[in-house]
Amino acid sequence: QLHPLYLSGCPTTANCGSLGTPTNPALSCEHLKSVCADTASDFYYIESAGLYHKVFCEMDIEGGGWARYGRSNQGTTWNYVDEDAAEITLDIINASEVKEMTDLKYNRFLVQTDVVFKMKADDSVNPSRLTTRSLPWLEESPLFIPDYGNDHTRIEFPSGSVDRVTCIPGSSSKCGQGGGLPTANGLSKPFFFQSLFFSPRGTGASAHNDQWNRNKYTWDGSYYFVYAK
């Protein structure tokens, strides 16, 4: 049986006003965009592979037709810059969103954020553990600085990219030596952050003689979105 908005296998703009509603769900955000090109970004109902979801469809970026996941309006919370004391846990993409991405079998992804991210361990142990999901496979993987950070190990977003990190060494480092870290000055494979546990405390976290805090992190911004189709 053909979907009600398909005639002889070809999409039609008939009933665009009802497509994506509870009584007439679309097959995907991409399907909704292809049938109803002028559809605005908003929440719509999607039914695919026997699964029924209410999804925010982004229709304006990169050709539109993307399902959007993540958080926004976090500017008063995500304001940690060179933090060396506060221990925090942040959920960026929740487990139900990851399950939905998996259930709906997305294979194209786009990460957008205004967050500035950095984390370092300098001759100390940084207990911070960041949970990532690989793209496009959505495999869970931890990201952390293993053992002592040696002379200096820092990870951050590289210039012009927010779906991977680079590892910046000092005279010695833990870059490329576990924890999901890329090689020195290299790039990781694409991923998105699912959750973050930042803890600047740990063995050798500060040098008391000169008050030099060896562990720091920065997570400063207002939104983090993962788009999928």
Curated annotation (Swiss-Prot):
It is found in: Secreted. Keywords: Glycoprotein, Secreted. This is Echinolectin 1. GO terms for cellular component: extracellular region. Glycans are attached at N94. Its main location: secreted.
